[in-house]
Regions:
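Short, amphipathic alpha-helical "recognition" segments used to contact nucleic acids or chromatin
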Residues: 59-71
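N-terminal Lys/Arg-enriched interaction segments
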Residues: 2-15
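RNase H-like nuclease fold core
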Residues: 13-20, 24, 31, 35-40, ...
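Alpha-helix N-cap/N′ positions at the starts of helices
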Residues: 56-60, 229
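Acidic/histidine-rich catalytic cores and adjacent linkers
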Residues: 4-5, 236-349
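Conserved beta-strand -> loop -> alpha-helix junction used to position metal-binding or nucleic-acid-contacting
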Residues: 185-192, 197-233
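Short, charged amphipathic recognition helices of the HTH superfamily
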Residues: 71-81
Length: 349
């Protein structure tokens, strides 16, 4: 709309403003009252006012509402509610919104996995959740994959005991039941329960130990003043052009470290095969296969977008909000560029 003076006439002007109609627009920072122009001829209505909230936005508002209605809010929570523009916290309205969001997230969580998935990353984040009148850190585990076309996809997510082999077996079996197949390499941290579950459920897949987590574990056994030197030694292993050369360099580094840092040398020797598993795959993929960093970035994004909640009222609200965020990210990946090029994927088949 052009804001011409009332008496101005121009050749481009095909109609005239004839007052306004008021419309409330609910935003994350509150409700804004808009004055939408009425026309003498024709109609005008801004299309962006008709756009529904994105799933993660709806889920965030819902979690805040649910916490508030359940009586677990604090002064800070009340402030957040006001900033989100939430008014009229009616329990039946919250219940209806919760049901709709649950169905949407559950459908995504249980959808069929119809493409072969070559690489899988597994990791967890630990947000705070109310449980039996206590506040506990609850594991929210995520499985990220790269399918046969080179695109990333969210394979699944769940709340559970991330240190338990039984939990991981159940989680991985649920992925297989939905169609997960063709897995050649799984990348994760060295949780014993997880390693055993991978061997049991994804039989035939290799396991890559996260290089970043391994480095932290090794350096924990090295005096502060020597950490950078030891890290530099270890990095020379990963700079080698192939698996054979990396193995030879690892042996040399172990010999160098053993006299002064025997525990670090021992850990490095024991981890050789799991630490260098990624080098059996296309070189163009090495950087992303050597660690859990692709999933760590995803976890940071979830943390960033859920930090306003701070404490989830229950497990369901955690799954609802984190699941909605993952849905949005997965949709963006589906239409975005490939994570690995089609050409670089060809040697795997």
């Amino acid at each position: 709309m052009r804001s011409e003076r009332r008496s101005t006439k121009t050749p481009e002007r095909v109609t005239q403003r004839n007052g306004y109609r008021r419309r409330g627009w609910e935003t994350r920072v509150g409700e804004i009252e808009l004055e939408i122009p009425k026309l003498r001829q024709g109609t005008y209505y801004p299309e962006w006012l008709l756009e529904p909230r994105r799933p993660a936005e709806k889920a965030l508002v819902n979690v805040i509402q649910e916490a508030y209605v359940s009586g677990v809010s604090t002064r800070k929570m009340e402030k957040v509610v006001r900033e989100l523009g939430v008014k009229g916290l009616d329990k039946s309205k919250v219940s209806r919104m919760t049901k709709a969001l649950n169905e949407e997230v559950e459908a995504f969580q249980n959808r069929p996995l119809d493409k072969r998935c070559v690489y899988v990353w597994l990791d967890a984040l630990y947000p705070k959740v109310r449980q039996n009148h206590r506040i506990v850190s609850q594991a929210f585990v995520i499985a990220l994959g790269v399918d046969e076309t080179g695109h990333r996809t969210i394979l699944g997510f769940q709340v559970g005991a991330a240190e338990s082999e039984a939990f991981w077996v159940e989680f991985l079996r649920s992925l297989v039941k939905r169609g997960l197949r063709g897995v050649q390499l799984v990348i994760s941290d060295a949780h014993e329960g997880l390693k055993k579950a991978i061997a049991k459920v994804l039989n035939g897949a290799s396991w890559q130990r996260c290089r970043v987590h391994f480095m932290r574990n090794v350096l924990a056994h090295v005096p502060k003043g020597d950490k950078e030197l030891v890290a530099a030694y270890i990095r020379t292993i990963f700079a080698q052009p192939d698996r054979e050369a990396a193995g030879q360099q690892l042996d040399k580094v172990v010999e160098e470290l053993a006299p002064r840092w025997p525990k670090a040398a021992e850990l490095l020797q024991e981890a050789e095969h799991d630490l260098l598993a990624y080098m059996r795959y296309p070189r163009a993929h090495w950087k992303r296969l050597s660690s859990s960093n692709p999933l760590e970035r995803l976890i940071r994004e979830i943390r960033r977008r859920t930090e306003v909640v701070q404490i989830f009222p229950d497990e369901g609200s955690l799954i609802r909000l984190a699941g909605a965020i993952l849905m949005e990210i997965n949709d963006e990946w589906a239409v975005g560029r490939r994570y690995f090029s089609e050409k670089s994927m060809q040697p795997l088949f």
